[in-house]
């Protein structure tokens, strides 16, 4: 019974060794390891001279020897052919429980603060940490106070918002409300908003008035343009020059009429006398 148990254990050992050697095969993240051939032992017949005592003539003890032969072993000058051996490539190791699967990356130094090794020498850091081994804290408060409404307090790997004295943080963390109730809008004692609105309305009224005046100014020009075409003039400017000339003639005629009226008046006075 004991002999059969020993044979069974021997077979299990052979299977385990063979399974380990055959667990790896060339492939992804599995590399061939350079193996040296093992020395070969060979057997040979060794001649040995064995001394012994015997009885010679005259009943004397004599020493002589005899030749015997036995099997001996010696190392052969050659080497046995090396079998290919495989192992995980540098930077990778076996995944626990999966023989032959080299899926676990190795990071040296190891990743810190909850970081995971995703590739040899490369760590993936959780939120709040950075660096080659996730050793440095990220200062969330350096950019826009971390989104806090009033104060931002940076901690190792995280941050939190803090309100001024007399205020408390809202449930969603976006507002700091006065303790005892929601914030109320304080009246504006300076009346800046009202004055600004009045100024905007006043400027808008001026713009409307200027637009009306512009239309009044442009109306004669449109009329002049049509009249210039009627008089055969090339442009409204020529019509203006022509109109000014006519006005000059009218003024001259008015002066002459006034002079004639004065003369007529003086003549009537002399006739009456």
From Swiss-Prot:
Residues 103-135, 137-177 form the EGF-like domain. One of its GO terms (molecular function) is calcium ion binding. Residues 1-23 form the signal peptide. Pfam families: EGF_2, EMI, FXa_inhibition. InterPro entries: Dev_Signal_Modulators, EGF-like_Ca-bd_dom, EGF-like_dom, EGF_Ca-bd_CS, EGF_extracell, EMI_domain, Growth_fac_rcpt_cys_sf. CDD domains: EGF_CA (cd00054). One of its GO terms (cellular component) is collagen-containing extracellular matrix. PROSITE patterns: ASX_HYDROXYL, EGF_1, EGF_2, EGF_3, EGF_CA, EMI. The keyword Ubl conjugation does not apply. Keywords: Angiogenesis, Calcium, Cell adhesion, Coiled coil, Developmental protein, Differentiation, Disulfide bond, EGF-like domain, Repeat, Secreted, Signal. Residues 27-104 form the EMI domain. It is found in: Secreted, Extracellular space. Disulfide bonds join 31-89, 56-62, 88-102, 107-117, 111-123, 125-134, 141-152, 148-161, 163-176. GO terms for biological process: angiogenesis; blood vessel development; cell adhesion; negative regulation of Notch signaling pathway; positive regulation of endothelial cell proliferation; vasculogenesis. Residues 192-219 form a coiled coil. It comes from the Eukaryota. A motif (Cell attachment site) lies at residues 130-132. Interacts with ITGAV/ITGB3 in an RGD-dependent manner, increasing endothelial cell's motility. Regulates vascular tubulogenesis in vivo. Inhibits platelet-derived growth factor (PDGF)-BB-induced smooth muscle cell migration and promotes endothelial cell adhesion to the extracellular matrix and angiogenesis. Endothelial cells depleted in EGFL7 by siRNAs display dramatic alterations in adhesion, morphology, and sprouting. The defects are in part due to diminished RhoA expression and impaired focal adhesion localization. This is Epidermal growth factor-like protein 7. It comes from Homo sapiens (Human). The lineage of its organism: Eukaryota, Metazoa, Chordata, Craniata, Vertebrata. The gene is EGFL7.
């Amino acid at each position: 019974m004991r002999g059969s148990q020993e044979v069974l254990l021997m077979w299990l050992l052979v299977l385990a060794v063979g399974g380990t050697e055959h667990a790896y095969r060339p492939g992804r993240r599995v590399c061939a390891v350079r193996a040296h051939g093992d020395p070969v032992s060979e057997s040979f017949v060794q001649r040995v001279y064995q001394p012994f005592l015997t009885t010679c003539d005259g009943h004397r003890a004599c020493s002589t020897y005899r030749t015997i032969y036995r099997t001996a072993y010696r190392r052969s000058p050659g080497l046995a052919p090396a079998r290919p051996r495989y192992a995980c490539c540098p930077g990778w190791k076996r995944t626990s429980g999966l023989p032959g699967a080299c899926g676990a990356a190795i990071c040296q130094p190891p990743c810190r603060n909850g970081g995971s090794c995703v590739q040899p020498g490369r760590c993936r850091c959780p939120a709040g940490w950075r660096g080659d081994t996730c050793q440095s804290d990220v200062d969330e408060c350096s950019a826009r106070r971390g989104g806090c409404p009033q104060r931002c307090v940076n901690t190792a790997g995280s941050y939190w918002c803090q309100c001024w004295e007399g205020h408390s943080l809202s449930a969603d963390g976006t507002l700091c409300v006065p303790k005892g109730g929601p914030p109320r809008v304080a009246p504006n004692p300076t009346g800046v908003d009202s004055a600004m609105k009045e100024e905007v309305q006043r400027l808008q009224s001026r713009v409307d008035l200027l637009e009306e005046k512009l239309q009044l100014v442009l109306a004669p020009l449109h009329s002049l343009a049509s009249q210039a075409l009627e008089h055969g003039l090339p442009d409204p400017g020529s019509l203006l020059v022509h109109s000014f000339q006519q006005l000059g003639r009218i003024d001259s005629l008015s002066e002459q009429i006034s002079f004639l009226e004065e003369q007529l008046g003086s003549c009537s006075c002399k006739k009456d006398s």
